[in-house]
Amino acid sequence: MKPFNELGICILNGYIFVFVYFDFNFNYIINEIIITIYSVEI
């Protein structure tokens, strides 16, 4: 059971890291997508 718990903690930490990373970069990513869409349309 211990290896499973350690794996679960690693996965949880990974999800937290991804969530925080995207939370910080979400606005930038959306702006890049909008700029790209406008550039393609123009």
Curated annotation (Swiss-Prot):
Topology relative to the membrane: Single-pass membrane protein
Subcellular location: Membrane
Organism: Dictyostelium discoideum (Social amoeba)
Any Gene Ontology CC annotation: membrane
Membrane-spanning ranges: 7-29
Name of the protein this chain belongs to: Putative uncharacterized transmembrane protein DDB_G0284993
Keywords tagged on the record: Membrane, Transmembrane, Transmembrane helix
UniProt keyword Membrane, yes or no: yes
